[in-house]
Every structure is written in C-alpha cells, then in structure tokens.
C-alpha cells in the first residue's frame, strides 16, 4: 500500500477535513493533540498530513511534495495552475462579495479603486462587467479601505457579514460561491494506485452529504 500525502489548510478547513475523513471511516484520532507539529502520519502509515497556509497547499501539490490538497476555492482562483481539481467538498462555505460604505454607487461610471486580497477574482469580475477599475492589493484588513478613503469598494470573502457590518460596510453584490476543494498532483494520480479509491470514497460521502443539505 502506497502512502498518500495530503496538504491541509490550517484552521477551519483542517477541522472540517478531519470530520469528513472520520465520517468516511478513517481513524483520525492521531490528529487530536497536534501541539505545534505540522506533519502527521497515521498509525498505519497510509496517510501523511501537512498543515500549511492556504496559498501553500497549491505549491506543495504542484511540486509533488503532496499528492492531494484540501484548500478553499478562493485560493484556487488566485493560483489556477499546476494541479487537478477533483471534488467540491461542500464545506468551508462562503462567498466573494463586492462591499463598500452605504454611500457607494456601483452604477457610477467613474473609474473606481477596488481594494482586495484577491486581485485575480476582482479583475475578472469587473472585466465581465466591462468596467475599468484600479485594483489595490491589500494583505491585511481590507474592510477599512473604503472607510479610510483608500478605495471606493472592496472585493472580499464574506461568511457571516459580521466583520463588514462592524466596519460600516454593506454588500452590494455577491460574486460567486466559495467552498473547500480537493486537488491532486497529476503525476501522483498516475503513479499511486491508492489515490483514486480514496477519492472515490470521499466523493461518495460528499455526494450523500450534498443530498442531505438540500
């Protein structure tokens, strides 16, 4: 049996993945007391898990260090190449939205400044609308950009909307749905015969979960 290395996004996606794999019948108890460790191997050596930041999941998969990766679709929009996207896992649900202060007019034809941590998503969104905008890349708290006058509006991930409302912002348009995805290294799919049966088992479970959610 060949070991499968899976790169996981630390945090909520990591926790939801552990729940999913437990429901699929895998013993994930070895992940319970992580401490500061970032690499974990299952007792039967079938799996090795790497806990990394979201953008790094695609890097580890692209270079073949990880066979599979579980990461938010928001990351895949910004890093679209070097892997195969296999499954929508139907957790980590949120959305991309256009938000700003209440006085913002989305129909104003002046050239707007848009602050975002996701320049590819923002650029594609405004290109589809036929609007020429200036994209300002922000790595930190993008919500304060319209309040301070740095930008006219923001494009950002929205889960509950609490952070937006706490900073006096409103959602003007929802752009697209975001969820966790299973990605794979193409060479690993070809060379490791244990990957596709594992993927099929997860796909079966995700399909049942999706039906249950409807």
From Swiss-Prot:
GO terms for biological process: L-histidine biosynthetic process. Its EC number is 2.4.2.17. It comes from the Bacteria. It is found in: Cytoplasm. The keyword ATP-binding applies. It catalyses: 1-(5-phospho-beta-D-ribosyl)-ATP + diphosphate = 5-phospho-alpha-D-ribose 1-diphosphate + ATP. PROSITE patterns: ATP_P_PHORIBOSYLTR. Pathway: Amino-acid biosynthesis; L-histidine biosynthesis; L-histidine from 5-phospho-alpha-D-ribose 1-diphosphate: step 1/9. It is an enzyme of class 2 (transferase). Keywords: Amino-acid biosynthesis, ATP-binding, Cytoplasm, Glycosyltransferase, Histidine biosynthesis, Nucleotide-binding, Transferase. GO terms for cellular component: cytoplasm. Disulfide bonds: none annotated. One of its GO terms (molecular function) is ATP phosphoribosyltransferase activity. Belongs to the ATP phosphoribosyltransferase family. Short subfamily. Lacks the C-terminal regulatory region which is replaced by HisZ. Heteromultimer composed of HisG and HisZ subunits. Catalyzes the condensation of ATP and 5-phosphoribose 1-diphosphate to form N'-(5'-phosphoribosyl)-ATP (PR-ATP). Has a crucial role in the pathway because the rate of histidine biosynthesis seems to be controlled primarily by regulation of HisG enzymatic activity. This is ATP phosphoribosyltransferase. It comes from Streptococcus sanguinis (strain SK36). The lineage of its organism: Bacteria, Bacillati, Bacillota, Bacilli, Lactobacillales.
């Amino acid at each position: 049996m060949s070991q499968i290395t899976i790169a996981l996004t630390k945090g909520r996606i990591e926790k939801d993945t552990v729940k999913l794999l437990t429901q699929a019948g895998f013993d994930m108890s070895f992940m319970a007391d992580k401490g500061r460790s970032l690499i974990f191997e299952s007792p039967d050596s079938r799996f090795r898990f790497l806990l990394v930041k979201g953008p790094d999941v695609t890097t580890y998969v692209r270079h073949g260090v990880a066979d599979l990766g579980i990461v938010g679709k928001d990351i895949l929009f910004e890093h679209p190449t070097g892997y195969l996207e296999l499954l929508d896992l139907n957790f980590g649900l949120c959305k991309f939205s256009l938000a700003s202060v209440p006085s913002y007019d989305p129909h104003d034809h002046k050239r707007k400044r848009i602050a975002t941590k996701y320049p590819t998503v923002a650029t594609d969104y405004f290109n589809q609308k036929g609007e020429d905008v200036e994209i300002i890349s922000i790595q930190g708290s993008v919500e304060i950009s319209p309040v301070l006058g740095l930008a006219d509006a923001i494009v950002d991930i929205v889960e509950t909307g609490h952070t937006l409302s706490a900073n006096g912002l409103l959602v003007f348009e929802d752009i697209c749905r975001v969820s966790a995805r299973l990605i794979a290294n193409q060479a690993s799919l070809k060379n490791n015969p244990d990957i596709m049966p594992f993927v099929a088992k997860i796909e079966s479970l995700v399909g049942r979960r999706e039906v249950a959610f409807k």
